[in-house]
UniProtKB/Swiss-Prot annotation:
Disulfide bonds: C66-C83, C69-C72, C70-C79, C73-C82
Lineage of source species: Eukaryota, Metazoa, Chordata, Craniata, Vertebrata
InterPro entries for this protein: Hepcidin
Similarity comment: family membership: Belongs to the hepcidin family.
Signal peptide residue numbers: 1-24
Entry keyword set: Antibiotic, Antimicrobial, Disulfide bond, Hormone, Secreted, Signal
Pfam families: Hepcidin
Biological role stated in the UniProt entry: Seems to act as a signaling molecule involved in the maintenance of iron homeostasis. Seems to be required in conjunction with HFE to regulate both intestinal iron absorption and iron storage in macrophages. Antimicrobial activity against Gram-negative bacteria such as E.coli.
Subcellular location: Secreted
GO CC, any one term: extracellular region
Protein name as it appears in the record: Hepcidin
Amino acid sequence: MKTFSVAVAVAVVLAFICLQESSAVPVTEVQELEEPMSNEYQEMPVESWKMPYNNRHKRHSSPGGCRFCCNCCPNMSGCGVCCRF
């Protein structure tokens, strides 16, 4: 009889644990609001993406006299390394 009451007690405890886990409210995930992306291409002004170059500031150029710039060398379309200096 003692074994039967222990088995019933264990079954009740397990049932109670299962009920507690199934009734727990799940943590709601915070949904990050994302800005809708527009398909419009926004043109940047040339002054904002051309790299300024001053001959007195040698730290902006590499030892070979080349530098990275955009549309600053002849026959260059886009950005790249220019060694005309």
